[in-house]
């Protein structure tokens, strides 16, 4: 995929310069910008309004730690994230991903795509996503519960 519109090329380059180590997010932005190219060509007022600049930058991105106890009473620490994109049509909506591969780039990518998924439902909701590098596989139900309780307690400080 490539972008031919100079305005969208500039937007994509700004995102690349700002977030060079976030390949999942950069791929999602490239895909969306190239898809929206015909729309931007027909509506120059979107450029004048800075619509795309606002669309590709999250309103909030938070990284935090989640400390929880395993079944042996040992404290474990995981990294967690919450990214919120574009509340123009309503509050943020999006789920949680718990997987060892989770990082900021993945959560930004998922939150960015959530904007479009939510807008297509017709419900007034913006896009958001949260997650952690916590791996629930092999954990007991009690460990998963303690992790989730700690995750929500920590997240509540920011939303």
Task: Cite the ranges covered by each PLM segment.
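N-terminal ligand-binding/catalytic initiation module
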Residues: 1-159
């Amino acid at each position: 995929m490539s972008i031919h519109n100079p305005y969208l090329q500039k937007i994509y380059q700004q995102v690349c310069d700002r977030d060079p180590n976030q390949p999942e997010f950069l791929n999602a932005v490239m895909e969306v910008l190239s898809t929206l190219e015909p729309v931007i060509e027909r509506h120059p007022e979107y450029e004048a309004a800075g619509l795309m600049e606002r669309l590709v930058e999250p309103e909030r991105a938070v990284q935090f730690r989640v400390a929880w106890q395993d079944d042996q009473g040992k404290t474990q620490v995981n990294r967690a994230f919450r990214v919120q994109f574009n509340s123009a049509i309503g509050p943020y909506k999006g789920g949680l991903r718990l997987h060892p591969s989770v990082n900021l780039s993945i959560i930004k990518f998922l939150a960015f795509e959530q904007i479009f998924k939510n807008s297509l439902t017709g419900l007034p909701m913006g896009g958001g996503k949260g997650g952690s590098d916590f791996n629930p596989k092999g954990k007991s139900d009690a460990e998963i519960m303690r992790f989730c309780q700690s995750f929500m307690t920590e997240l509540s400080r920011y939303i």
